[in-house]
Amino acid sequence: KTSTRTRCAFEVAARDQGAGVTYLESSASQIGHKESIKDTARVLGRMYDAIEYRGFGQETVEELAKYAGVPVFNGLTNEFHPTQMLADALTMREHGGKPLNQTSFAYVGDARYNMGNSLLILGAKLGMDVRIGAPEGLWPSEGIIAAANAVAEETGAKITLTANPQEAVKGVGFIHTDVWVSMGEPKEIWQERIDLLKDYRVTSELMAASGNPQVKFMHCLPAFHNRETKIGEWIYETFGLNGVEVTEEVFESPAGIVFDQA
């Protein structure tokens, strides 16, 4: 998958530590075309000390990890975004001013994919109060929920899933969201998602529903918060929305900490 923040973060971090970096783009390499993932893993593992993979299938990064013989970092798949969780946990610790196991946060929107899944597991592992606010059909899979609940029993985390966005955000310190249509999905899906998720848009009213005047807004980016992108303008012209999952007012407010998070 394409990348701005994840690729830059890995490359800057590697070079800060004195490591060399090679970027292999799928369209300019043989990965998955003329050479299997298994064979690619065994070649790259002999040349490099570590591999970061960003793509669609979780099974691909797991196959790389199985055969490479070196550490493999998941830079994002459809199912998980673990390196983003490191950034999110650090950001909540920095801006929350208290231990993570005393911190509460909500994720509102489409919770079936990498951010919803990862935030649920993150909150469970760190003993946090984590809320998912989404239509029931857009919750994480039963397997992900069961895994999170099992971890929560050991860590003392509190897990709540609700279709009521106001209930989800009540009393939290942080409100997270993500785009409603993921990379690779067709434009035709937008109308369906807007109809499903319009009540989960992060507005000033939803922020106020937390009852916490210090509540912060988080988003892994990129965000559709205005008309300043080609897609943002297309959404406005097609559906009349200036900003989709979050309004410009919230995104640019002092509550927004998305650039520290990024």
UniProtKB/Swiss-Prot annotation:
Changing residue 36 to R: In strain: CCUC 7757. InterPro entries: Asp/Orn_carbamoyltranf_P-bd, Asp/Orn_carbamoylTrfase, Asp/Orn_carbamoylTrfase_sf, Asp_carbamoyltransf_Asp/Orn-bd, Orn/put_carbamltrans. Keywords: Amino-acid biosynthesis, Arginine biosynthesis, Cytoplasm, Transferase. Pfam families: OTCace, OTCace_N. It comes from the Bacteria. The record marks 94 as: Important for structural integrity. One of its GO terms (cellular component) is cytoplasm. L-ornithine binds at residues 114, 178, 182-183. GO terms for molecular function: amino acid binding; ornithine carbamoyltransferase activity. Carbamoyl phosphate binds at residues 3-7, 30, 54, 81-84, 219-222, 247. Its main location: cytoplasm. GO terms for biological process: arginine biosynthetic process via ornithine; citrulline biosynthetic process; L-arginine biosynthetic process. Pathway: Amino-acid biosynthesis; L-arginine biosynthesis; L-arginine from L-ornithine and carbamoyl phosphate: step 1/3. It is found in: Cytoplasm. Reversibly catalyzes the transfer of the carbamoyl group from carbamoyl phosphate (CP) to the N(epsilon) atom of ornithine (ORN) to produce L-citrulline. Belongs to the aspartate/ornithine carbamoyltransferase superfamily. OTCase family. This is Ornithine carbamoyltransferase. It comes from Neisseria lactamica.
